[in-house]
Amino acid sequence: MKKINLAITGCMGRMGQQLIKSANKDKAFKITSLTESRRINKRIFGIRPEINSIDAFKKANVIIDFTVPKCTFEILKIAFKLKKKVVIGTTGFTKKEEKLIKKFSNKIPILKAGNMSLGVNLLMYLT
């Protein structure tokens, strides 16, 4: 089985850390890059986090974004140039920003969900 190469943004945040742990346990995934808004001088599972860039996302099949709206649009611009799939878990977008994400989704595959926490998903499943 071919692995899915992941780039995980916001790697120092709570969701970023959880994604890293989960992806490392699952043989279907390989983390090709981790990004953060500032330089980090430590390795996480052998990977040194980078700043969002074309080089950081080149090897990924999918970019997973759990950052802030400003960073999400940086990421979407790069993903568009590279024709990468994006999963957006970031929240707090304005209506104008939501429309812009919709425009990007006409060009590249985007999965956007405002809340991917276990508790919310369990609640949605039970109702």
For the regions a language model picked out, list residue spans one by one.
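Extreme N-terminal starter segment of soluble prokaryotic enzymes
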Residues: K2-L6
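N-terminal Rossmann NAD(P)H-binding glycine-rich loop of SDR-like oxidoreductase domains
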Residues: I8-I20
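NAD(P)-binding Rossmann-fold cofactor-contacting core
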Residues: S22-G46
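Short glycine-/small-residue-rich Rossmann-like dinucleotide-binding loops
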Residues: T67-V68
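Rossmann-fold NAD(P)-binding glycine/threonine-rich loop
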Residues: L76-K77, K81-L82, G89-A113, L118-T127
